Swiss-Prot record:
It catalyses: 7-aminomethyl-7-carbaguanine + guanosine(34) in tRNA = 7-aminomethyl-7-carbaguanosine(34) in tRNA + guanine. This is Queuine tRNA-ribosyltransferase. Keywords: Glycosyltransferase, Metal-binding, Queuosine biosynthesis, Transferase, tRNA processing, Zinc. Pathway: tRNA modification; tRNA-queuosine biosynthesis. Catalyzes the base-exchange of a guanine (G) residue with the queuine precursor 7-aminomethyl-7-deazaguanine (PreQ1) at position 34 (anticodon wobble position) in tRNAs with GU(N) anticodons (tRNA-Asp, -Asn, -His and -Tyr). Catalysis occurs through a double-displacement mechanism. The nucleophile active site attacks the C1' of nucleotide 34 to detach the guanine base from the RNA, forming a covalent enzyme-RNA intermediate. The proton acceptor active site deprotonates the incoming PreQ1, allowing a nucleophilic attack on the C1' of the ribose to form the product. The keyword Phosphoprotein does not apply. HAMAP family: Q_tRNA_Tgt. It comes from Methylacidiphilum infernorum (isolate V4) (Methylokorus infernorum (strain V4)). Homodimer. Within each dimer, one monomer is responsible for RNA recognition and catalysis, while the other monomer binds to the replacement base PreQ1. GO terms for cellular component: cytosol. Substrate binds at D91, S92, G93, G94, F95, D145, Q197, G224. Its EC number is 2.4.2.29.
């Protein structure tokens, strides 16, 4: 993988970049739609490709259980299995193990947990996490980390941070040993990211950042945010870590993805984002519009003949009214969720295009002013 910073914004850490992957060029700042189980929910892959989306996220934890890494490998890897021609970033599954799995127990070797599918006990290690993602053929592989809950005691935060560093070292060693064996393309084309932990303790975050940079990764992710902490504390962590990290490497904030949060974090120098909100909110009947979020299930939209957003050119906005989509959702028709999901993802994609355009034209400050205080729900 190669990352290029094309242009920086004066008076800000915001930057325009380009990520070169084995499956195409990804322009940054970039938002990754979440395809947890090898699909972005309620969306055809071709629709994402037609809208210029180049990078999506999948999760090794979920794929480990269903259909299984070995099954996907038999199909030729994750790209072939899911019919996706763009790039894929896979999460190691650490967050899901700690947050979703019952009977989770941590050891120096890794984390032991109970399968949500058949109840068997499994062990996820830094080595097995790397192996699984490499066998999937991921363009960007994430190291295994220990994501502590919020709030956590100082002692627990320190232990999780040290464990994350040790696991990152072991993951990097495995990566170096295995990549040429598993990848048919030149190994340098693929990349390994380290994940920075430390809760909202900025000193621990800097300590973790420094140690991961000593190990050396192709990119750096800030994990363990959006787990209940106040947004102001999240933002402070991102600001501190982003200003400390190597400027030549891509920076990724994991799981934080409200539009106004993305704008704030782009201003702090972040390049990559992911979040389940666009499709999750769609499944609950909500749509992103220029003014904020509207809840189409509300009775006031029953006879509304206007499109979801008059400034949007997506298929849902071109062809259908708010009233019709309201009807679909109330009738529990799948089409309603599909239309809202695509609309919301294209809202995000359009936002990222606007961000890149304003950065390219040296007008980032103007764009930032437009988004001030945008946290509206209707």
């Amino acid at each position: 993988m190669k990352f290029e910073v094309i242009q920086k914004s004066g008076g800000s850490r915001a930057r325009l970049g380009r990520l070169l992957t084995p499956h195409g060029v990804v322009e940054t700042p970039c938002f990754m739609p979440v395809g947890t189980s090898a699909t972005v929910k309620a969306i055809f892959p071709k629709d994402l490709e037609e809208e210029g989306i180049k990078l999506i996220l999948a999760n090794a934890y979920h794929l480990l259980f269903r259909p299984g890494i070995s099954v996907i490998k038999e199909f030729g890897g994750l790209h072939q299995f899911m019919g996706w021609n763009g790039a894929i970033l896979t999460d190691s599954g650490g967050f899901q193990v700690f947050s979703l799995s019952p009977f989770c127990k941590i050891f120096p070797e890794g984390v032991r947990f109970k399968s949500p599918v058949d109840g068997s006990f499994l062990m996820l290690t830094p080595e097995s996490a790397i192996h699984a993602q490499m066998e999937l053929g991921s363009d960007i592989v994430m190291s295994l980390d220990h994501c502590p809950p919020w709030p956590s005691k100082e002692k627990d935060l320190l232990e999780a941070t040290r464990r994350t560093i040790q696991w990152a070292k072991r993951g990097k060693e495995t990566w170096m040993q295995q990549q040429e064996k598993l990848f048919s393309k030149p190994s340098a084309s693929y990349s390994l990211f380290g994940i920075i932990q430390g809760g909202t303790d900025e000193r621990l975050r800097l300590y973790c950042s420094e140690e991961l940079m000593k190990i050396g990764f192709d990119g750096y992710a800030i994990g363990g945010l959006s787990v209940g902490e106040p947004h102001e504390e999240s933002l402070a962590v991102v600001k501190t870590v982003s200003s400390f990290l190597d400027e030549k490497a891509p920076k990724y904030v994991m799981g934080m993805g409200q539009p106004w949060q993305i704008v704030q974090m782009v201003d702090l120098g972040i390049d990559l984002f992911d979040c389940v909100l666009p499709t999750r909110l769609a499944r609950h009947g909500s749509a992103y519009v220029e003014e904020g979020i509207i809840h189409i299930k509300n009775a006031r939209f029953r006879k509304d003949g206007s499109p979801l957003d008059s400034r949007c050119s997506c298929y849902a906005c071109r062809k259908f009214s708010r009233g019709y989509i309201h009807h679909l959702l109330k009738s529990k028709e799948i089409l309603g969720i599909m239309l809202l999901s695509m609309h919301n993802l294209l809202f995000y994609n359009r936002l990222m295009k606007e961000i890149r355009s304003f950065l390219a034209h040296g007008q980032w400050v103007d764009f930032l002013a437009r988004w001030k205080d945008k946290k509206v729900t209707k």
